[in-house]
Amino acid sequence: MSIERTLSIIKPDAVAKNVVGQIVARFEQAGLKVIAARMQQLSRTDAERFYAVHKERPFFKDLVDFMVSGPVFVQVLEGESAIQKNRDLMGATDPKKAAPGTIRADFADSIDANAVHGSDAPETAAVEVAFFFPEINIHSR
């Protein structure tokens, strides 16, 4: 096992429901540490840049529109196997297919408004963390 860092975004739907604290508590209860965090309103340009990998997909415009529809809570999580642990806690992308007790099963409304984003691999985690948090703003604890 190795200590990893991963990016977690609590999306506009979950922020609007006022469940940020409940979601962060789940990460902490699973042994993940929040080592950087902030609430922010994404600009359209930032959302398009962050999700550029999906630019040619039919859902790209709707995804960007959703991500700029309200503030997001962006955080870096650190811990043993943080990437997989975060993905397990989030559950399936489609909340209808998410296991009971996962974040998406409990807080998401649809495959589009699915409460959270998490990095899917070490390489993407490094890129995604750097997108939101220059190294100077990350503090292991």
From Swiss-Prot:
Coiled coil: none annotated. Keywords: ATP-binding, Cytoplasm, Kinase, Magnesium, Metal-binding, Nucleotide metabolism, Nucleotide-binding, Phosphoprotein, Transferase. Pfam families: NDK (PF00334). ATP binds at K11, F59, R87, T93, R104, N114. Its EC number is 2.7.4.6. GO terms for cellular component: cytoplasm. GO terms for biological process: CTP biosynthetic process; GTP biosynthetic process; UTP biosynthetic process. The keyword Ribosomal protein does not apply. Belongs to the NDK family. Homotetramer. PANTHER family: NUCLEOSIDE DIPHOSPHATE KINASE, NUCLEOSIDE DIPHOSPHATE KINASE DDB_G0292928-RELATED. This is Nucleoside diphosphate kinase. It comes from Bordetella pertussis (strain Tohama I / ATCC BAA-589 / NCTC 13251). The gene is ndk.
